[in-house]
């Protein structure tokens, strides 16, 4: 369950659904959707969506130019390899997503501890109020 103290956009971008065969992770970002069986794969796809969108908006090329190859008197065009800058940006995005998710887990743990402490405090306060003598203000 999402707590309003820790909810963020990453909850919409990386969703977990329970299915009879196990968890299903869904990466949704920039009009693209990918369903995965592992969290690691979903994080990589989410980073791929985000990095691709950033490169498209900035105008930087993601790949090297296409290469013409002559095979058996036929002209064949092969797509260029992915650029090193794109791969580095993708890896940075994966690291940042993992860091955000780790920080979110820590916040949720702290909120659970806080809620437990607060419930104990309220219970103890109610008990003290119930046993309060008449003359005490």
Question: What kind of feature is each model-predicted range?
Answer:
Residues 1-137:
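Intrinsically disordered, low-complexity linkers and terminal regions
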């Amino acid at each position: 369950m999402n707590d309003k103290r820790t909810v963020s956009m990453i909850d919409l971008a990386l969703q977990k659904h329970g299915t009879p065969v196990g968890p299903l992770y869904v990466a949704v970002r920039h009009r693209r959707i990918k369903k995965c069986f592992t969290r690691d794969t979903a994080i990589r796809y989410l980073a791929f969506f985000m990095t691709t969108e950033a490169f498209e908006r900035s105008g930087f090329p993601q790949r090297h130019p296409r290469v013409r190859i002559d095979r058996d008197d036929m002209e064949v065009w092969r797509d260029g390899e992915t650029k090193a800058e794109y791969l580095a940006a993708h890896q940075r995005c994966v690291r940042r997503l993992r860091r955000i998710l780790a920080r979110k887990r820590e916040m949720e743990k702290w909120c659970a501890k806080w809620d437990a402490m607060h419930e104990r405090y309220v219970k103890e306060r109610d008990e003290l109020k119930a046993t309060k003598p008449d003359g005490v203000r």
